[in-house]
Amino acid sequence: MRVLRVDASARVDDSVTRRLADLMLEILGERVPDLSVVRREAAGMPFVDDAWVGANSTDPEARDSAQRWALAKSDELVSEVMAADVLVIATPIYNFGVPASLKAWVDQVARARLTFRDTEYGPEGLLTGKKAYVLVASGGTEVGSDIDFATPWLEFVLGFLGITDVEVIAADRGMLRGDSARQNAAEHVADVLERDWPALAEAS
């Protein structure tokens, strides 16, 4: 089984979402002997710029060396997503949405003709057959509430790319709920993996 883990928290040593991702991969590692994990930090992710847009709009066979260089990081990120059976996206909610670094990662992997394509019936996602776990933490925003713009957007954009099997596990309102938010989320991780294990085992 090939897992792509994307960490978006600005915190490194005291991150709730990183701990949840660690737990998820620990449980998977106990069950999957040949588990392969690629870790990707969203921090420092390059933003789409004019050179990127021009290169991406150029036919691949017609791109010059500068254009290929402009898309090199994006190509690497796309390859990681395409190779993964399971995505683990660990993200806090900042100011009601996802961190800018995670949005930048999405912009780098949402590539026409690679991860989605336009058809006469509308856009079609090409990253089908994958499972995504979105591990979310927040200080005060309740996941699923009217002020949560992070998880609905992630579910939508993943579905747009063809990843429609998305599970959200939330340790939300941590400032109000304290340790109970983290404990409940950890238990949810274990329960979800137990439930999903038959399908995950088949994928592995």
From Swiss-Prot:
SUPFAM superfamilies: Flavoproteins. The keyword NAD applies. FMN binds at residue 9. It holds the Pfam family Flavodoxin_2. Keywords: Flavoprotein, FMN, NAD, Oxidoreductase. It catalyses: 2 a quinone + NADH + H(+) = 2 a 1,4-benzosemiquinone + NAD(+); N,N-dimethyl-1,4-phenylenediamine + anthranilate + 2 NAD(+) = 2-(4-dimethylaminophenyl)diazenylbenzoate + 2 NADH + 2 H(+). GO terms for molecular function: electron transfer activity; FMN binding; oxidoreductase activity, acting on NAD(P)H as acceptor; oxidoreductase activity, acting on NAD(P)H, quinone or similar compound as acceptor. Its EC number is 1.6.5.-, 1.7.1.17. Its cofactor is FMN. Binds 1 FMN per subunit. The keyword Cytoplasm does not apply. Homodimer. Belongs to the azoreductase type 1 family. Quinone reductase that provides resistance to thiol-specific stress caused by electrophilic quinones. Also exhibits azoreductase activity. Catalyzes the reductive cleavage of the azo bond in aromatic azo compounds to the corresponding amines. This is FMN-dependent NADH:quinone oxidoreductase. It comes from Thiobacillus denitrificans (strain ATCC 25259 / T1).
